[in-house]
A protein has these predicted regions:
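A donor-sugar binding/catalytic signature common to diverse glycosyltransferases
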Residues: 32, 52, 332-377
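Amphipathic alpha-helical interaction motifs in eukaryotic regulatory proteins
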Residues: 32-42, 273-277, 288, 305, ...
Length: 428
């Protein structure tokens, strides 16, 4: 009993978070699991420090992205969270762990470890030293065989405790306002609550669709598919594959046709345009493009823009002064797109991946509509050179009837953060 009291009052869980890919989305999941592990151990959690992401070169910290006070407040009845390690543990730094074997560092957490693993292997460290650092920590907590309370806590962290910092929400709300009331225009308000309030009062809000599109060079090259850009593009992508992965791209063993019919080729902006048109969207649809950088630039999205002239993005809707605080910061740019995606009437993503999974799950949790394109069907239809437009449209509509937000239950081994039902839902 004494040991436990000691643990709950003094222990710290210090987590290393080396980020990769779209940074803040990976972090979502790590921080949720960190809270769960702290709960299992009755330990205090120290807000993690982020390392600069080598790919995105983004030095944004947890506190630059998320509203930390909100985070701590929402979880105050669940666990104790502190922003910094207390003075007596100041020696417990990233450098300290990087430069030698340390008794307070736990390196052996297996992938998808059980709750028992933590009480057997980390609790003794906490009891002896008052602090433990678990690194690496990605995917180190199982999704199955966890108590209901722990699952609920993970849901609470992911869907309620993590809120973006006020300036991201303010910018996001301005974008949403301008999409809903295109004629009025509005200044970015630093008081996001006020702006949200005004939004609710105004009448005749227009609807908008968010299209999440990831079609960057990295992805195009890695898919090993062809994208109709002719010989020059084929050579450019082949060269990129050679330089970046020394040719080791798993998909290379398949032909373009095989990959396409399996739905393994990213959809091009043009293909997505045809999909949207087949589903009944038209030139009166207000479309927001949530996208980082499109390989091929404006030329590649020309067809999409022709079909949907009311297409907007972060850049078209804001001035450069308004974007100054997020300029060049991949995680903040992604956060703004995430925020707008969460508030759209319809969300459609043509790019499976972290952002896709996170937004789809969050929208499921909030019961908002999402369209999930069938990549395999699209691949097959685009290969068919004799298909007419009415046939294409018919096939698309038929296949997408039950891909418009119907809840899919999590299966064993799947992530709670991708499939929040049933664990995060009421009466589960
Ligand atoms: C944590 O606290 C709870 C409630 O006080 C207790 O039931 C549980 O055994 C504790 N767990 C550990 C690992 O100390
Ligand atoms: C939208 O499409 C309709 C029907 O194809 C056409 O008549 C109309 O001119 C278009 N409007 C704009 C603004 O392009
Ligand atoms: C192409 O589509 C047409 C019309 O649906 C169909 O009859 C034909 O079999 C398809 N061809 C291939 C190669 O799948």
């Amino acid at each position: 009993m004494i040991a436990i009291a000691y643990v709950s009052n003094r222990s710290m869980l210090f987590l290393s978070t080396l980020l990769n890919y779209v940074p803040f989305l990976i972090l979502f999941i790590k921080i949720c699991d960190a809270v769960a592990v702290a709960k299992i151990l009755n330990a205090t959690l120290v807000i993690p420090h982020l390392e600069v992401n080598p790919v995105w070169q983004d030095s944004s910290t947890f506190m630059d992205i998320f509203d930390v006070d909100h985070f701590i407040n929402i979880l105050q009845d669940d666990i104790l969270i502190v922003k910094e390690v207390p003075v007596e543990f100041y020696w417990s730094t990233r450098e300290y762990y990087a430069t030698g074997i340390r008794a307070t560092r736990v390196k052996t957490a297996p992938v998808h470890a059980s709750a028992n693993w933590y009480t057997e292997n980390v609790l003794p460290v906490l009891q002896s030293y008052g602090i433990a650092a678990i690194a690496p920590f990605s995917h180190r907590l199982a999704f199955d065989d966890m108590s209901k309370d722990i699952q609920r806590l993970r849901c609470k962290v992911n869907f309620q405790a993590l809120a973006f910092v006020p300036h991201i929400r303010a910018l996001g709300n301005s974008l949403i306002n301008r999409l809903r009331y295109p004629a009025q225009g509005s200044e970015v308000s630093t008081n996001y609550l006020e702006e949200l309030d005004n939004t609710n009062k105004k009448k005749g809000a227009g609807k908008f669709v968010v299209l999440h599109l990831r079609f960057d060079k990295d992805m195009a090259a890695h898919s090993a598919c062809e994208f109709g850009g002719g010989k020059a593009e084929r050579l450019a992508l082949a060269k990129y594959r050679q330089v970046i992965w020394q040719g080791r791209v798993l998909n290379s063993q398949f032909t373009d046709e095989e990959l396409r019919s399996q739905g393994r080729c990213p959809l091009t902006p043009e293909e997505i345009g045809l999909l949207l048109a087949a589903l009944g969207f038209d030139n009166s649809t207000r479309l927001y493009l949530a996208s980082h950088k499109v390989y091929g630039g404006e030329a590649r999205i020309l067809t999409l823009r022709d079909l949907f002239p009311l297409m907007e993005d972060k850049k078209s809707l804001t001035s450069s002064e308004e974007r100054a605080s997020i300029k060049g910061k991949a995680s903040l740019l992604a956060a703004v797109d995430y925020y707008v995606s969460m508030h759209s009437d319809i969300f459609i993503s043509a790019s499976p991946g972290n952002m896709h999974n996170a937004v789809v799950a969050h929208r499921t949790y909030e019961n908002r509509k999402t369209i999930r394109p069938s990549m395999a069907l699209l691949g097959q239809l685009f290969l068919n050179k004799t298909l007419t437009w009415p046939e294409f449209q018919e096939a698309i509509r038929e296949k997408h009837k039950n891909r418009q937000g119907q809840i899919r239950l999590r299966k064993t081994g799947q992530s709670l953060y991708t499939y929040p039902a049933p664990d995060c839902m009421c009466n589960a």
